[in-house]
Amino acid sequence: MLRRVAVAAVFATGRKLRCEAGRDVTAVGRIEARGLCEESAKPFPTLTMPGRNKAKSTCSCPDLQPNGQDLGESGRVARLGADESEEEGRSLSNVGDPEIIKSPSDPKQYRYIKLQNGLQALLISDLSNVEGKTGNATDEEEEEEEEEEEGEEEEEEEEDDDDDDDEDSGAEIQDDDEEGFDDEEEFDDDEHDDDDLDNEENELEELEERVEARKKTTEKQSAAALCVGVGSFADPDDLPGLAHFLEHMVFMGSLKYPDENGFDAFLKKHGGSDNASTDCERTVFQFDVQRKYFKEALDRWAQFFIHPLMIRDAIDREVEAVDSEYQLARPSDANRKEMLFGSLARPGHPMGKFFWGNAETLKHEPKKNNIDTHARLREFWMRYYSAHYMTLVVQSKETLDTLEKWVTEIFSQIPNNGLPKPNFSHLTDPFDTPAFNKLYRVVPIRKIHALTITWALPPQQQHYRVKPLHYISWLVGHEGKGSILSYLRKKCWALALFGGNGETGFEQNSTYSVFSISITLTDEGYEHFYEVAHTVFQYLKMLQKLGPEKRVFEEIQKIEDNEFHYQEQTDPVEYVENMCENMQLYPRQDFLTGDQLLFEYKPEVIAEALNQLVPQKANLVLLSGANEGRCDLKEKWFGTQYSIEDIENSWTELWKSNFDLNSDLHLPAENKYIATDFTLKAFDCPETEYPAKIVNTPQGCLWYKKDNKFKIPKAYIRFHLISPLIQKSAANVVLFDIFVNILTHNLAEPAYEADVAQLEYKLVAGEHGLIIRVKGFNHKLPLLFQLIIDYLTEFSSTPAVFTMITEQLKKTYFNILIKPETLAKDVRLLILEYSRWSMIDKYRALMDGLSLESLLNFVKDFKSQLFVEGLVQGNVTSTESMDFLRYVVDKLNFVPLEREMPVQFQVVELPSGHHLCKVRALNKGDANSEVTVYYQSGTRSLREYTLMELLVMHMEEPCFDFLRTKQTLGYHVYPTCRNTSGILGFSVTVGTQATKYNSETVDKKIEEFLSSFEEKIENLTEDAFNTQVTALIKLKECEDTHLGEEVDRNWNEVVTQQYLFDRLAHEIEALKSFSKSDLVSWFKAHRGPGSKMLSVHVVGYGKYELEEDGAPVCEDPNSREGMQLIYLPPSPLLAESTTPITDIRAFTATLSLFPYHKIVK
């Protein structure tokens, strides 16, 4: 599956493609300017994948703490045991490596070893508790666990799945009313965006990513990651995509564990997950699992690299998974731009290769040319999956000696072929060609105007201690006074800007490093794109003339020093993935710090990079729908339409000259938001286990909890400003979106200093109110919060800004609607949630025209009558917390709501039977279809919700195995536990292609799977059932890795007004009471006579969905620019067994409504 971090050409198996909503990937060296639809501005837009959460930290860190004691062994070969006495062994068994530098706030212990076969490993003992005290498991505890393991029957045929974060194959435990249509939640990297069109659905959807399966005082998951120092650059010319394909194939059984889906099944049975990804020069595999099963999981996983089967029978089926991944990627503008950029490399450079692979390159062409793909796979594995290219990281609550023993026993079996690692460093200057310094006009899939300016520099990895590109990007991406973006925003030419290098394989490898600046343009900005480029060049020239500034460098150091010193712990599986890649790039002492810290100020190194950023070496790419009709070229693999033009002569001549600087552009002033007080505050009220309501008035209430667990000088402030005004009409919902986006725009410049000082804020246009989220070092956090409330109180907009934002919002709505997965979600929720305004409703309201006057009247009315609900947690006293609510109430001076307002929709009760809503996808160039089969349950208890979670957990692995592995229906295949505004249900979703399957064939296959699953759970043994229950209990007991996870869980209760802060404890108690018969009975009841079943099909364009077979039966009459639902009739496959829905409003108007319901009992 494509691991997309910035522009990295990377892939992953799809076993854990959840795009990790809410995990903010900020690569080192990239400063991200916030604003409307900013995903389009990214140099190479980002898709967040597990473990790519690289901190933006940079510091000199004079007080970094070495880890452990000096053993007197540097780079030692792993030892199998020790002869110390029992007492000595216990004291020395967790001694860390003194050369590895770590943060003072990191309680973990580290040890580096190198096996006899050349594999390098980093062992991480996570025995420490959050106070930083280390405690070893007793011998009795370890023996007891071992006895339990030995006594447990491992019945592979009974193994079932957990509810991890998977989107393509994972059980997705998320609330439907918490599902968003915002770009950041989607599968392709075009839309990873924290601030564009945020709404409450996304706010809660982000929370659900982390809310499930977290509880304090219990142990974390164990995790491991292995990086092979070879990637797609090594693809043979006659088999494009082979490295990516091999990454898929090694999962398909091994000599020791031959079951094709055996590893996934084992993990799902024991609460784990796995993933893999392929980059240009690296391939990464990672998994996590309950600690009790970590050693066995390591042994099973290691067989990928010891003796994978890669049987011939599996090849054709897995090629289809790779091809589906490619088809899903084709409508992504980021992927298209990347392939186009790679094609500019000089002939013979690996950047010109097709890294993805598809059915054509891996199946049809090889057969035509008599190439044995199976034999070539094995050759590739033998040549490149060699131990001495590998770096391994394992993390668990075991002693370092225990981990060393396991790693040595298991991973020493990986073969070492003794051959030198592939080296591409001689292929420098791949873009030093006449074709590079040109203007490329590109026709995008989405509605967007964007300008990307790119330079290809010599490789910068060797300068990691200075990080010159990070220094430059910090200035280029600044949004304060004197910045590029501040100037362009004042001209109403740009909405967002991103500049830098993400340090991924595509942006930085052994042959070059990229520095890119991407700018989201307004309509007017598109007309002046040369002037926009000139502004960028003027700013860079100013930096070049000034030279590196030590003040700026030291400010970045101070900011990042604070963040590193007080860093919060991350999820183990993310952490080990990041570390195994770091081991490929940095010396031992910098494994933990190399990607985060600035160690040395060397102005000559910064100047060398900065002086190369000149117009004569720049590549310009202009994305716009306005380019259609003038682009006569087509890129081979993604079909991107583009043209190549010389840069206009007048601009070329100007940029060759000593052009004038712009007096409006200058360096940022000193930052007043940098924290200097890190004192941990004393309690001023009794300590509580859960948030307590400390203020309750007609105008609002406040929940508060002082942190006494993580003990870091940070705080989280969240407020929900609730108003009944928003949902009164589609126009109001749109006005609210405009309001929040203009408010964000207005705050961009004054709040940016706080943002770069690690004080983060986010404004969310919720379904029922404005959500304000602020977090960071508590010292200066009140300043930022007050700034936001001040700007909210004094809200204003110029006509130019109003026009700019509304035009961009039209593009944003359009871009959401043309994606099958988001349209499918919109259609499903439009059917289920009464009085919901669909995205098409909002698009039409916007196209009908709204005025600035109507916006200002709406905002005035919105602010006049509210109910404010807040949560404050962290290093803050109760008195200080009450001041936050008081500031909101005093500044806004609103009256209370007349009556209590529900923060959820009412849901329609589906009739019995099978209903089908089949609509056309809105992008005629997209073959992708989305099929969801949903079963409605109704108003259920917390016990039944938990039972449904258990059901979906059981369902996940066999669903993946049947629908993806065996039937090869698509890449994204997953069952989901649905909580739609308090009404329960479950669904199975498959993303497929109209070039391969009819959507109704897929629907029938889903039904076939569910029938077989019923038989499977009926035959489930009690032991297998109990093992799955235990796995889910362990997930729910999994401790929070940092304060933010605890806050997310509590905020989810506040923002949904459920307030069941000990929900996990209740769910665990419910799980302990379940029997196998409960599960079977519940499933049969929802699948038997009287079941309420809804199928939603969004149908792509391809030979299996021909127009003549699906002529529209009804078109929504209120069309705007073709944005309408086109309903299709069922084909003979489903015509007799389903009732078609050909008008959603007419269908739901006849249905009863469930009462408002909360799952709290």
UniProtKB/Swiss-Prot annotation:
Binding site for Zn(2+): H244, H248, E325
Enzyme class: hydrolase
Claim: NAD is one of the keywords in the record: no
Tissue distribution: Testis, and in a lower level in brain, heart and adrenal glands.
Any GO CC annotation of this UniProt entry: mitochondrial matrix
Swiss-Prot/TrEMBL catalytic activity: Hydrolysis of polypeptides, preferably at -Xaa-|-Arg-Lys-, and less commonly at -Arg-|-Arg-Xaa-, in which Xaa is not Arg or Lys
Active site annotation, chain numbering: E247 (proton acceptor)
Compartments, record wording: Mitochondrion; Cell projection, Dendrite
GO MF: metal ion binding; metalloendopeptidase activity; peptidase activity
Source species, domain of life: Eukaryota
GO terms of biological process kind: negative regulation of cold-induced thermogenesis; positive regulation of axonogenesis; positive regulation of membrane protein ectodomain proteolysis; positive regulation of myelination; proteolysis
Stretch forming the signal peptide: 1-18
Free-text cofactor note: Binds 1 zinc ion per subunit.
Pfam families the UniProt entry points to: Peptidase_M16 (PF00675), Peptidase_M16_C (PF05193), Peptidase_M16_M (PF16187)
SUPFAM superfamilies per record: LuxS/MPP-like metallohydrolase (SSF63411)
Listed Acidic residues bias regions: 138-209
Disordered: annotated span: 42-105, 130-218
Keyword vocabulary terms for this entry: Cell projection, Hydrolase, Metal-binding, Metalloprotease, Mitochondrion, Phosphoprotein, Protease, Signal, Zinc
Cofactor: Zn(2+)
Record flagged with keyword Zinc: yes
Modification Phosphoserine, positions: S85, S91, S93
Family (UniProt): Belongs to the peptidase M16 family.
Summary of subunit composition and partner proteins: Interacts with BACE1 and NRG1.
Protein purpose: Cleaves peptide substrates on the N-terminus of arginine residues in dibasic pairs. Is a critical activator of BACE1- and ADAM17-mediated pro-neuregulin ectodomain shedding, involved in the positive regulation of axonal maturation and myelination. Required for proper functioning of 2-oxoglutarate dehydrogenase (OGDH).
Stated name of the protein: Nardilysin
Source organism of the structure: Rattus norvegicus (Rat)
Name of the gene encoding the protein in the UniProt record: Nrdc
